[in-house]
Every structure is written in structure tokens, then in C-alpha cells.
Curated annotation (Swiss-Prot):
SUPFAM superfamilies: PCD-like. This is Putative pterin-4-alpha-carbinolamine dehydratase. Pfam families: Pterin_4a. Keywords: Lyase. It comes from Ralstonia nicotianae (strain ATCC BAA-1114 / GMI1000). One of its GO terms (biological process) is tetrahydrobiopterin biosynthetic process. The keyword tRNA processing does not apply. Belongs to the pterin-4-alpha-carbinolamine dehydratase family. It is an enzyme of class 4 (lyase).
Length: 101
């Protein structure tokens, strides 16, 4: 099983990725992204989906019009791992490229 992130790694992750927060009910991180419209939100989700397939690590997400809520956790490890950190970094880049507010 993959090890979960330790306290130091978590602090570094949150410092690097502003706006992400730890969920209260489980060992997962969450962020809400807002875009100009549905097309921009869907374009963002498409970029993330392609990367998720490539690395075989998939987000939990919810989309309503221009808003996308994303939660990351590694189910096999029952918590946050480097896979979540890596995908969160990619998600941040994709959000910038697609005009997240």
C-alpha cells in the first residue's frame, strides 16, 4: 500500500496550492473552481480527465454550469498520497490555462 502524506508534506502541499482545504469527514483535499461559463468549465474538466486517465488516478468532482468542485484522495491508501499532490498540481495548471477565476 502507498504511504499517506506526513504532516510536513501536507504543510508544504497547502503552502504550494492555495485554496485547497482538508475535508472534515475524511483524509481528502477539496477545491472549488469557477470559470466564465460552462464551456470553460467543461474544457477544464476535459484536460483533467485526460491527465487522470494517463496517470490512472481519478478525481471526485461535481459540475454545475461554470463551477467545478474537486476532491482528491487515494482510495487504496485511505488518505492523501503523492498521487493526490501531483494531480492537484496539474489541476492548478489546467485551471490557469482555462481561465479559472
Amino acid at each position: 500500500m502507498m504511504p499517506t502524506l506526513n504532516d510536513e508534506q501536507r504543510k508544504a502541499l497547502f503552502a504550494e496550492l492555495p485554496g485547497w482545504s482538508l475535508q472534515n469527514d475524511r483524509d481528502a483535499i477539496h477545491k472549488r473552481f469557477t470559470f466564465t461559463d460552462f464551456n470553460a468549465a467543461f474544457g477544464f474538466m476535459t484536460r483533467v480527465a485526460l491527465k487522470a486517465e494517463q496517470v490512472n488516478h481519478h478525481p471526485e468532482w461535481f459540475n454545475v454550469w461554470n463551477r467545478v468542485d474537486i476532491t482528491l484522495s487515494t482510495h487504496d491508501a485511505n488518505g492523501l498520497t503523492h498521487r493526490d499532490a501531483d494531480l492537484a498540481r496539474f489541476i492548478e495548471q489546467a485551471a490557469q490555462l482555462t481561465g479559472a477565476k
